[in-house]
């Protein structure tokens, strides 16, 4: 199995994928993150890293069995979300799986608390509590963190002619699984 992680960051998910696949490719737009991923994953022969944008990937069509964009990447990347899904579908083989994840609405209080801690440590701006709600966290410095709910995932998928399977896990995450036709 050949897997691709979009927005691999420092390699936390890559490291877990390595024992389960023949080859895993991680892409990110941050060279600093990719350098950290090299160290964190201890550069295994079955790992490839590339500095690349997830909405315009330089891979051939149908190159991967599994394409992942987890940890709310579909919202965190600040890109055209439908284009991201279109590209993920393009590079995934027929019968392969595209797997996306975001936060469950049930996880709102925990998520907001985490952002408040980050704000208190000046890692992000002060939270604008009047503008924050419905899965969207807004900071007074202009930063905005969103999520994709079931309806959003279904809308993206139907616009591209594919059918998603949405699963909620532990009242914390929503997973959107699409088997590529």
Language model segments and positions:
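Core SAM-dependent methyltransferase catalytic element
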Residues: 162, 166-181
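Conserved class I S-adenosyl-L-methionine
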Residues: 1-7, 99-126
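A short SAM/SAH-binding and catalytic strip from SAM-dependent methyltransferases
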Residues: 66-80
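A short glycine-rich, Lys/Arg-flanked "PGG" loop and its adjoining helix->strand segment in the class I
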Residues: 82-94
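Class I SAM-dependent methyltransferase SAM/SAH-binding core
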Residues: 10-56
């Amino acid at each position: 199995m050949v897997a691709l992680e979009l927005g691999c960051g420092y390699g936390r998910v890559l490291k877990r994928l390595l024992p389960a696949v023949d080859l895993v490719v991680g892409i990110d737009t941050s060279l600093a993150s990719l350098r950290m991923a090299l160290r964190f994953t201890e550069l295994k022969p079955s790992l490839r890293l590339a500095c690349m944008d997830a909405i315009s990937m330089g891979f051939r069509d149908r190159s991967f069995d599994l394409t992942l964009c987890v940890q709310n990447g579909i919202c965190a990347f600040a890109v055209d979300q439908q284009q991201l899904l279109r590209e993920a579908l393009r590079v995934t083989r027929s019968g392969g799986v595209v797997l996306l994840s975001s936060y469950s609405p049930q996880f709102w209080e925990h998520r907001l608390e985490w952002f408040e801690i980050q704000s208190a440590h000046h890692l992000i701006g002060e939270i604008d509590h009047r503008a924050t709600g419905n899965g969207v966290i807004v900071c007074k410095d202009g930063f905005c963190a969103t999520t994709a709910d079931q309806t959003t995932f279904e809308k993206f998928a139907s616009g591209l002619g594919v059918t998603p399977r949405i699963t909620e896990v532990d009242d914390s995450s929503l997973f959107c699984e699409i088997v590529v036709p």
